[in-house]
Amino acid sequence: DFINAVNMAYEKEESKPAKDAMAQILINSRMCAEGHRPICQDTGIVTVFLKIGMNVKWKTKLSLNEMINEGVRAAYNHPDNKLRASIMDDPAGVRKNTGDNTPAVIHTEIVEGSSIDVQIAAKGGGSEAKAKFVMLNPSDDIVDWIVKTVPSMGAGWCPPGMLGIGIGGTAEKAMILAKSALMEPIDIQKLKERGAKTTTEKLRIEIYEKVNALGIGAQGLGGLTTVLDVKIKDYPTHAANKPVAMIPNCAATRHAHFVLDGTGPSFQTPPDLNEWPKITWDVGPTAKRVDLDTITSDDIKNWKTGETLLLSGKMLTGRDAAHKRIQEIIKKGDSLPNGVDFKNRFIYYVGPVDPVHNEVVGPAGPTTATRMDKFTEMMLDKTGLIGMVGKAERGPVAI
């Protein structure tokens, strides 16, 4: 459903930068399906929604959380498709990586029956960082708040994607509703064709149309499609409150839905490669080839805003944690470690997945550039760095 929705948006897109971005998403996602590797290195924190039949019996001494985390551990350390461990213990302190992407975030509901309904998502941190919540007054307009808030999210959530909206309950209930809404398949075009019949369906269409009218576009490059669908779940709330949560999903949408009935494992069928559109990406005659091994500051002065650059050569990688360590080294007056030389080099804001088999490097999607804004002046002034590669936007401090 997601590939079909991106392709539909690609076909109607009029902005060349946005159309190019969606072409690359479609082409790269097919390559990833062929190679059994993620399109982005951030395979996120595992979120699980369970509906457990009250007649289910367990043949194990493990707790429910232990069983799920054992599955996460096995999946993320699979030798043929090792995924990045992204989960930090002691989040307000030393932030030590747990090493196996556990623990998962688990939501459980007890229902009638003897089966287990499982919805599971591996959602990256870039889109999660743009989650929003507000406690509106009962008389306030939900759509107005969303249309005002979406531009403040920038492009770090990697559109085109989905918006999950949770309305009602309490503050924490609204957030859970928004997250669970993202598990639903894309069907906004079918809804528009048959027409809205409920309040939430009317809201879905109105938000979908007004957010896309903002012109943010794929990867924030300006265009017709920012959201591929809007999902809404609601819950009764207190008369004095109107809690609203909004959580976006990025272009690397990953979720699965299956049922365990006690007869054995549930096998997931990989998508048919024929489901991908047969498209090619033409970089155009104005694209510039850039050799990062020989580039100079004078070369960069000739670049123009909006140009397509085809990079080759070597570049360093690092995110805010690495930048903070560099900052501490420079403050102490110490030298950078042997082999770390930024003079006339580019840095790519990324933490790649470990390579498997004959890979040189694992999947490496860019990190939101604003995370490194506060280190930019130091890197340019103190290290000899001349270029940075990231996604989304830069803030006033960096600019």
Q: Where is each model-derived feature located?
A:
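Non-transmembrane, aqueous-exposed alpha-helical and coiled segments at domain scale
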Residues: 1-281, 367, 379-381
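Short, conserved beta-strand edge motifs with alternating hydrophobic and charged residues
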Residues: 160-166, 311-312, 348-350, 387-391
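A generic structural signal for short beta-strands and their flanking turns/coil linkers
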Residues: 161, 226, 286, 307, ...
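Feature captures the catalytic cores and cofactor-binding loops of soluble hydro-lyases/lyases
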Residues: 182, 186-215, 219-222, 317-399
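Short, structured beta-strand/loop micro-motifs enriched in basic residues and often containing a Trp
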Residues: 285-295
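Short, well-ordered loop/turn sites that connect or cap secondary structure elements
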Residues: 302-303, 309
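Short, charged beta-turn/beta-strand-edge "cap" motif at the junction between a beta-strand
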Residues: 308, 314-318
